[in-house]
Amino acid sequence: MIYGIIVSHRNVGHGILNALVGMYGDVDCLVSLSNEGLSTNELADNIREAARFAGEEGVCVFVDAYGGSCWRASKLARLRNAHVITGFNLPMLLSFVTKRATIPFGELPAVLETDGKRGIRIE
């Protein structure tokens, strides 16, 4: 099973995961990690620990901001068979939950990027 880890500043990831559960129901394929009170190395350790549940199919690490401590920790974790996807939003995560079982792991990031961008509108 393809697994997802949300890595964010403070409670951003927890909040978006809670919203996703409210929309979709139980989401056992995603976990949220916060950087609050952690060094970059400690957060990288937590990411590695969370990735153990991913198995061989792969893990998508969703990071809130490029270049920040969460992104650095995600890169420092050096996960095998992983995609680090920066700039997540609710439509992207909903797409992950609903499509991860039907789209090959190598193609999934492009689909998620498209769906995430599709969820952004200026009116």
Regions found by a protein language model. Give the residues of each.
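N-terminal loops that bind phosphate or other acidic moieties
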Residues: M1-E123
